[in-house]
Regions:
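Conserved catalytic core of the tyrosine transesterase superfamily
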Residues: 1-173
Length: 173
């Protein structure tokens, strides 16, 4: 359950693995369907989440997380913060621990072991652009100060470029 929530949130939010490790249960607004991330330079950003990511995360919080705490023979803090991703020992998982889990899951799925969690961030940005999101919105979602940084994350396919010309150029047919 924890792994499913981790993968869903990585893809749904475009977060860095270090941002994911820093998440608390309180980082999620269920009513607003958003996730509060703290990026580089302690910059805060709020990212909307889709239903599948929320459901996977809720299931983990309600079923998987308490089980991990019980196995570790620990008690959850009364007044928070409540780390979202915890280890079998009941401690907050570090970015390195989450990265190892990611690599293990990739290997189990038959994906080359050299893939990095950061690939999910690239995929997030590319899929948004392919789906019609504007570059400025993607910049905000990724938490980039510079638009040129966001452009590095994008992988425009030849089909996307053809569609852009066909839709936007006066003679593009």
């Amino acid at each position: 359950l924890r792994d499913a929530a981790m993968l869903e949130l990585l893809y749904a939010s475009g977060s860095r693995i270090s941002e994911l490790a820093a998440l608390d249960v309180e980082s999620i607004s269920w009513s607003e369907r958003t996730l509060r991330l703290w990026g580089k330079g302690s910059k805060e950003r709020i990212v909307p989440l889709y239903r599948c990511a929320l459901e996977a995360t809720r299931t983990y919080i309600e079923e998987g997380r308490p089980e991990l705490i019980a196995k570790a023979k620990r008690r959850d803090a009364e007044n928070g913060p409540h780390p979202l991703f915890i280890s079998a020992r009941g401690n907050r998982m570090s970015a390195a621990m989450l990265r190892r889990r990611f690599h293990m899951l990739a290997t189990l799925a038959g994906i080359p072991a050299d893939i990095a969690p950061h690939a999910m961030r690239h995929t997030f940005a590319t899929d948004l652009l392919e789906g019609g999101a504007d570059l400025r919105s993607v910049q905000e979602l990724l938490g980039h100060a510079s638009l040129s940084t966001t452009q590095i994350y994008t992988h425009l396919t030849p089909d996307r470029l053809k569609r852009a010309v066909a839709q936007a150029h006066p003679r593009g047919e």
